[in-house]
């Protein structure tokens, strides 16, 4: 949940059967891994950090694409690893790892850059008057109504964001939707009285919405367990590529100086 007027997500535990509150609100991202998340998203610098990380993603896209183009005949020696000299091995490994990981790194960089820089291209949300939610409104009844009006809809999470005509939004997915879309790419909106206001089926959305809906899985590799592991390995690749690339650059610079 987010405190009214705030921007930070917090967690609170509630007994699903009795409705009793079992904990105090606590930051959603806390501890060591929470700090890592904030560093990853914005270097702990709010908007300025987002801009830096976003343009770093743009730079990473350029590096991945240009490297792929420079080594466009990669299929000739893709699996060749020569161990005769360290420089030769570093060059072969740099090219092979770069080619294998380039598609994943491009997908990760494009989605990450968009998330960090989208505030530059999208208008700020309107400050609409909040809408009161009927105290007697049944969430179970809304879920049932949603599934009746949107056959095949599977609920993923419920958003209580009262503003304008929208008060309760059910986020989910269709069982037969494209595997590229995430688990809450479709949504059903109700007003504070439980009246159905909108059904947003991602399969009927325009190209831009469908593209943006595919970013989450493309960024995290959440297609299946095997792809998660592949994305993990690809995430380690920039470390090796940076070290090997710097080493090769140093060797070439020294060679040119000696030749001069």
Protein language model regions, located:
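Conserved histidines in hydrophobic membrane contexts and catalytic metal-binding motifs
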Residues: 1-260
């Amino acid at each position: 949940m987010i405190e009214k007027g705030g921007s930070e997500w917090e967690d609170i535990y509630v007994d699903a059967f009795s409705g009793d509150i079992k904990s105090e609100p606590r930051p959603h991202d806390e501890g060591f891994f929470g700090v890592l998340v904030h560093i990853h998203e914005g270097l702990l610098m709010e908007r300025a950090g987002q801009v830096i990380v976003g343009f770093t993603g743009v730079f990473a896209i350029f590096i991945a694409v240009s490297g792929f183009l420079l080594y466009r005949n990669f299929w000739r020696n893709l699996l060749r690893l020569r161990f005769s000299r360290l420089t030769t091995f570093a060059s072969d490994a740099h090219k092979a790892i770069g080619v294998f990981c380039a598609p994943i790194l491009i997908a990760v960089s494009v989605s990450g850059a968009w998330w960090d820089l989208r505030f530059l291209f999208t208008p700020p949300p309107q400050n609409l008057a909040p809408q009161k939610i009927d105290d007697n409104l049944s969430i179970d009844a809304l879920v049932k109504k949603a599934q009746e009006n949107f056959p095949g809809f599977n609920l993923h999470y419920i958003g209580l964001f009262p503003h304008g005509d929208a008060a309760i939004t059910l986020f989910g997915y269709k069982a037969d939707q494209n595997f590229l879309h995430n688990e809450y790419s479709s949504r059903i909106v109700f007003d504070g009285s439980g009246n159905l206001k909108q059904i947003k089926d991602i399969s009927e959305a325009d190209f831009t919405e469908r593209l943006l809906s595919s970013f989450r899985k493309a960024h995290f590799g959440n297609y299946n367990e095997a792809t998660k592991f592949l994305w993990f390995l690809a995430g380690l690749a920039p470390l090796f590529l940076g070290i090997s690339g710097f080493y090769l650059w140093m060797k070439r610079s020294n060679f040119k100086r000696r030749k001069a």
